[in-house]
Amino acid sequence: MSQPITRENFDEWMIPVYAPAPFIPVRGEGSRLWDQQGKEYIDFAGGIAVNALGHAHPELREALNEQASKFWHTGNGYTNEPVLRLAKKLIDATFADRVFFCNSGAEANEAALKLARKFAHDRYGSHKSGIVAFKNAFHGRTLFTVSAGGQPAYSQDFAPLPADIRHAAYNDINSASALIDDSTCAVIVEPIQGEGGVVPASNAFLQGLRELCNRHNALLIFDEVQTGVGRTGELYAYMHYGVTPDLLTTAKALGGGFPVGALLATEECARVMTVGTHGTTYGGNPLASAVAGKVLELINTPEMLNGVKQRHDWFVERLNTINHRYGLFSEVRGLGLLIGCVLNADYAGQAKQISQEAAKAGVMVLIAGGNVVRFAPALNVSEEEVTTGLDRFAAACEHFVSRGSS
């Protein structure tokens, strides 16, 4: 018989780039998880905005099993039916004319930045290579995307970094305007900064970026890795703003827990990419595509998207009630089911401690930096699960406050 797996095994065997919780989940259903000891958790973390339909959704399992019984992989010398169906669904539902599939948000953003550089190179010349991104952004962990991210703590130890990337202040169109010029090939922005604290962009800011990109012949890239696939109550967050990007990246919820990412592009942008200019071995594989196709089918409905907006109200109303009782937060913000509770000055820097108390109470939440407790639950989380989970979160807040901040 094999040895039991324990949390200590992680510290023995894994490269230590993560610091996971002390418990190991072993089973999930809907918005509930159970650990090795059988303890139940209400999951408001959603695998960091990935598990858009909860755990072990029966229709996703069916889609995966059906494709798994046929074939798993061929490589990109061949196409397959599930990926073509998925591409058509994304094209029909968005501004895009073309799609490139990959395995993660970082890969999708890498592809977008490469496409933008090539578009400018082919059309205007090699001098037009500048990328403008934003402070406190997050676009992934490849060297290119982590450099674009605007958080030096993630990139400073990996120098020399890719050149010609500058960072403006988020939600500050004057700061962006000072950096965007005729040497700029692209501007990359999150409609809501997720890792940066759940900070929604203003409408004027995104409209201003669109106008600046038009003026300087730069591509506008929306990183919707975290905000996409129904998370905000629209299929993609750009739909809230009436601002259409040239390129859009999507991943996380697109696979509902199965790894998949995509770059959506207009025909004009896609045309610069020819055979051999980019690729990835597993991109568009039939397993991921079959699952993602079912995810889109289930999420892109008025009932589901309106339900996200309703659930937003459930969360915000109850979180404000909790805050009225314990006085932890200066603000509750976000769109749809991407919600951030900003700690007030008395509790600054202690979001991690609150998330740990929450886990002890049987509810999983996220953080977004040291000052924001983040919620990214399944889009179909039930009212009972919201009530139970927030009861547990309230108990965690009470315990945190009663023991005193430290």
UniProtKB/Swiss-Prot annotation:
Its EC number is 2.6.1.81. Gene3D superfamilies: Aspartate Aminotransferase, domain 1, Type I PLP-dependent aspartate aminotransferase-like (Major domain). Its cofactor is pyridoxal 5'-phosphate. Keywords: Aminotransferase, Arginine metabolism, Pyridoxal phosphate, Transferase. GO terms for biological process: arginine biosynthetic process via ornithine; arginine catabolic process; arginine catabolic process to glutamate; arginine catabolic process to succinate; ornithine catabolic process. The modification N6-(pyridoxal phosphate)lysine is found at K252. SUPFAM superfamilies: PLP-dependent transferases (SSF53383). The keyword Transferase applies. It comes from the Bacteria. Belongs to the class-III pyridoxal-phosphate-dependent aminotransferase family. AstC subfamily. Catalyzes the transamination of N(2)-succinylornithine and alpha-ketoglutarate into N(2)-succinylglutamate semialdehyde and glutamate. Can also act as an acetylornithine aminotransferase. Is involved in the utilization of arginine as a nitrogen source, via the AST pathway, and also seems to play a role in ornithine catabolism. This is Succinylornithine transaminase. It comes from Escherichia coli (strain K12).
